[in-house]
Amino acid sequence: SLPSLLTRLEQMPDYSIFRGYIIHYNLASAIESADAYTVFVPNNEAIENYIREKKATSLKEDILRYHVVLGEKLLKNDLHNGMHRETMLGFSYLLAFFLRNDQLYVNEAPINYTNVATDKGVIHGLEKVLEIQKNRCDNNDTIIVRGECGKCSQQAPCPLETKPLRETRKCIYSIYFMGKRSVFIGCQPQCVRTIITRACCAGFFGPQCQACPGRGQNVCSGNGFCLDGVNGTGTCQCGLGFNGTACETCTEGKYGIHCDQACSCVHGRCSQGPLGDGSCDCDVGWRGVKCDMEITTDNCNGTCHTSANCLLDPDGKASCKCAAGFRGNGTVCTAINACETSNGGCSTKADCKRTTPGNRVCVCKAGYTGDGIVCLEINPCLENHGGCDRNAECTQTGPNQAVCNCLPKYTGDGKVCSLINVCLTNNGGCSPFAFCNYTEQDQRICTCKPDYTGDGIVCRGSIYGELPKNPSTSQYFFQLQEHAVRELAGPGPFTVFAPLSSSFNHEPRIKDWDQQGLMSQVLRYHVVGCQQLLLDNLKVTTSATTLQGEPVSISVSQDTVFINNEAKVLSSDIISTNGVIHVIDKLLSPKNLLITPKDALGRVLQNLTTVAANHGYTKFSKLIQDSGLLSVITDSIHTPVTVFWPTDKALEALPPEQQDFLFNQDNKDKLKSYLKFHVIRDSKALASDLPRSASWKTLQGSELSVRCGTGSDIGELFLNEQMCRFIHRGLLFDVGVAYGIDCLLMNPTLGGRCDTFTTFDIPGECGSCIFTPKCPLKSKPKGVKKKCIYNPLPFRRNVEGCQNLCTVVIQTPRCCHGYFMPDCQACPGGPDTPCNNRGMCRDLYTPMGQCLCHTGFNGTACELCWHGRFGPDCQPRSCSEHGQCDEGITGSGECLCETGWTAASCDTPTAVFAVCTPACSVHATCTENNTCVCNLNYEGDGITCTVVDFCKQNNGGCAKVAKCSQKGTQVSCSCKKGYKGDGYSCIEIDPCADGVNGGCHEHATCRMTGPGKHKCECKSHYVGDGVDCEPEQLPLDRCLQDNGQCHPDASCADLYFQDTTVGVFHLRSPLGQYKLTFDKAKEACAKEAATIATYNQLSYAQKAKYHLCSAGWLESGRVAYPTTYASQKCGANVVGIVDYGSRANKSEMWDVFCYRMKDVNCTCKAGYVGDGFSCSGNLLQVLMSFPSLTNFLTEVLAFSKSSARGQAFLKHLTDLSIRGTLFVPQNSGLPGNKSLSGRDIEHHLTNVNVSFYNDLVNGTFLRTMLGSQLLITFSQDQLHQETRFVDGRSILQWDIIAANGILHIISEPLRAPPTAATAAHSGLGTGIFCAVVLVTGAIALAAYSYFRLKQRTTGFQRFDQKRTLMSWLLASSSPRISQTLCMRPQRRHPQSPPVTPSQTLENRIWRTATLWGHCGPDMRSQQATTVTVPR
């Protein structure tokens, strides 16, 4: 690193005096505190000369400050001609830079030594001390502004471009928390804003404050005043009698120091001006003091020159005197050259031009202006800013010469300047985790990136990401990592009380907690879920429940917050994207820690019933067992499970009749439904996960929800709208986790849902038979592999491989008998008596719910009889045309005869015609006993009969939710709004069952909220009003956890969230519905890392109740859409796949159905091949990953150390540009006491091509690296099982893919063919020694590989400094080999055969050997110094 300022100056002895003054005035710290600086340092000689000339004793501090520019590191190339910069002395003291004859100057001092770098700045050497130039008198005004009101402990920031003062004001602020507004006394910062008004000192003018004209230090020669100031022109306004550019002379005809005396010469030349005395030199022919007397007599008798006058002195003596403008003795006169001496009194920047004898005119030279006596350089900057950009400074550099330099924060040539985008340098001062957005107003806006929060200057990520950044909380983070507590990586919000790192050293119980597996509970006890509690929130909160389940108390003493009355909050409000961190001074200890017995691999040993009995849930456990549900819950197709257990106390508190119902064996089916509602399948949910989802589907089929507590229940969890409270958390058993609750869950639709579980098989991805790819997400391996074709390498296509057969379990929504439609409404007549037991309900999972009535019945609920039928059984009864039947369900079947007719059916005339007096009503019948009886549906005395008002009697037989109306004797019933039916039986209309999701978005759930009413709610990971739903930004990159389950040597990319059903999802063009051609559809799926779904894949989704009324493309140009229930609006009541068939015109416009069974995209890194979930390196790396091949590996590495051919062989295994096939003997076929020659080893590699197992044809030969050939043969056993051999060695495992070839495992090593006899090698002793070391190293390698790899699945692991046994093999001339061997070995695939090591570690005696090599200086962290090898 570069030295500091003082250190660098110490290395420059010629500049030591200036360094001494910096120390004397203590300026180094002030200079070094700036982000950057530039110092102009005069050498020792220059300082000594300056002090001597000024007769001073030392340099003043102001002079040193005048040599320093802060905030910029100005290299020589940055010092532009005409540029100005403020100095450390103040903004009014500027340095100017000029380039003259290729020499760079600062002010008037040449820069002779440049670009001496320091850690933060640069030094330039000078040959002259800079004299302070004070030509600016800028005004520095300040105004006081107030910041925002906030907590006094965390002062609110001042507004932009202001600085805080020490003084603060008391203020009041409020916080709305948990439904209540709290008021606090806070502090408001006083901030100062500095406003600089540029101004020139008196006597200076223009933008750069140049000096006004004048002689010496006198402005306008002291004879006038200057038009000065920033906007001044520098023109002198002369006083009375004065004239000239600098008021340096008198007006014509005036003389004297005040130019107030007038000349009186009439015919002569006056001695005028400030230095004149007013005397007259007379012209030819005139004489006298005023030259007003004409000479008429020549007293000199013609002896005078023609340009002379003959004058008489007082004595009367005549003499000749040259006239004005001439000089001589009078007899000889010559014209005076006024320009002859001192340029005629003109300026040195003027030309003196003779006019008449003795006279001249002064004309300023080109580039200058003035009266000739005073000539000033023309400043082009004063007119039109010298042609410079308005954001540039124009600096005069010579007569009528100027340069343009863009102002700070601007760039360009000065003629055109544009704002510098500050965001391009150091991200504009924004956080590295922020976007810097540049505005045209020379401002930048810092905005934190997604997944970060803050003001843009400081941006923080998740709590899990922020904890390790702070040393005081890093130990808490490492404990979270070590004990797999990953909740804080989730979306939150959380409140974390992070103990100081040092507090872990002061807690003696940590060791016991760790050994008993309790540490994760202790760590969770420091986290409150569901709420982000800032310091002000804590001050008004008394307790909060932690993720561990126990509460912590919160108290305030002397304005300090304490947790559990013991841990002090040291720092607070470290806000992150998913919550807030408060640092506390000690570790918190929960009171109730649950010990969970586990085996050596960390698996929970106790089953559900044991754990339930241990924690007070025996009654619910017994119900599960008695109902036969235990085997269902523990079935592998459902595990892992999350169970909500009502306590024994909660079940005992149920009403007796409900307890009788639960424990009655006759109600086992209903009991199962209750119990299933307490189980979530295929999920082992953490407490923090439960509130994140809007709902959780239960094993019973209905949904339940978990919500966070409100009010005083901070951190508490409740089920189903706070019906049940969580009282125990994280009760682990062998196949899941349980949560204790304080009540039995009751669902409004309970009894109506009878979901079924459908399983079907899907093929997994095709890959190597050794490392067969995992099953897709949400599916499980069935334990069966199928042959398939795949493309493992970029240089090879269509290789036979294997794929897992994977089982997908679908929970199929289904209604119980007597219920129908998606929400399982009861059939007409009720679930217990559907269709009143007089018909069959079209129930289960259909939207119909219609009753198919038995013969004789009709009506919505089969509640009516056919015409002519009566009674509960609607039996037929026939009255003649002369009678009226009392029919219907409640009718008696009796026939009421007309007058004159009788008998049961009114088909017999009466013997005597009845006569009634008075006459009967027209609505009555005169009976045989001469009595009037009102007809059916009428009432009265027979004489007067009125129609019965049936609507007043039991609503006329109509349903309660129907309107009864009557016209005459006819009653009509009509269901009210929101209901449907015949009026006698009405059922609720479910708008969600219209076939088009109730008008909700396809990514929304339609929920019936009442008869004919519904609500649209966007699904998880979508936002909107339900009618329109857009994907929300995922709260967390799924690649951040365990690399998204990708291989360590793969790159993980989080895919855009899609609402999939068994991998199928629907895509629509941004342009709207049905805007995709077949080709565009394929592109749209590809952008989502998906493929176009096949017909079978869409069928699987339909089985999983995927219903979407929108047709889309399928593979092969087919178009279809799925329906799961009959609807006239969607598919014309077709249930299944509505198939439009394969389209001949692929340019038709449809939507598309895509297929993707993964959430992340895994891609093997450069130099690796695979599907991303499994990645293979080069042949050597793959060889190193197999513990069963370590003996051959040892031979290869020893060969590489022994000869150049060995190094070449190793290079073949690591060079990705060279491909080959490697046959490797397993350890059992190559015991440690046997060895291979170099030729033998080369005989195992074919470097001509890559030969897969199916490429090995019976009777063919393969050429090896040695140049020899290998014979391929086949054989079959009695069961016709084929075995392939290479030179008689059976191939045991094959097609193990590497990035540069393929590997086959064989039973025994191959032996190279013999060669001609060779001379014995010399150096036998040395060879033996090397052999001993190599053999022992090989044994060590085998042991190490077994020990290392038996504990974990394969994957390239970095060698540990303390544990690596390989580094002794790494000394090689090939950088590629060293690089390869220093890489981590590949992780062994879980489905690889078990490893049987040839020897065990326990029987080894170890010793230490010195390393032969290392992994290079760039791999020091992986390098070892010693290696242990067995004797």
Swiss-Prot record:
Processing after translation: Glycosylated.
Compartmental location: Cytoplasm; Cell membrane
Keyword Lyase appears in the UniProt entry: no
Segments on the Extracellular side according to the record's topology features: 1-1322
UniProt GO MF annotations: calcium ion binding; cargo receptor activity; hyaluronic acid binding; low-density lipoprotein particle binding; low-density lipoprotein particle receptor activity; scavenger receptor activity
Tree of life domain: Eukaryota
Cytoplasmic side: 1344-1431
Residues carrying covalently attached carbohydrate according to the record: 112, 140, 231, 243, 301, 329, 437, 607, 858, 929, 1145, 1161, 1233, 1249, 1258
Stored PROSITE patterns: EGF_1 (PS00022), EGF_2 (PS01186), EGF_3 (PS50026), EGF_LAM_1 (PS01248), FAS1 (PS50213), LINK_1 (PS01241), LINK_2 (PS50963)
Gene Ontology CC entries for this record: cytoplasm; external side of plasma membrane; plasma membrane
Transmembrane segments: 1323-1343
Domain notes: Recognizes phosphatidyl serine via its epidermal growth factor-like domains.
Subunit structure of this chain's protein: Interacts with GULP1, heparin, alpha-M/beta-2 integrin (ITGAM and ITGB2), and thymosin beta 4 (TMSB4X).
Function description: Phosphatidylserine receptor that enhances the engulfment of apoptotic cells. Hyaluronan receptor that binds to and mediates endocytosis of hyaluronic acid (HA). Also acts, in different species, as a primary systemic scavenger receptor for heparin (Hep), chondroitin sulfate (CS), dermatan sulfate (DS), nonglycosaminoglycan (GAG), acetylated low-density lipoprotein (AcLDL), pro-collagen propeptides and advanced glycation end products (AGE).
Name of the protein this chain belongs to: Stabilin-2
Gene name per UniProt: Stab2
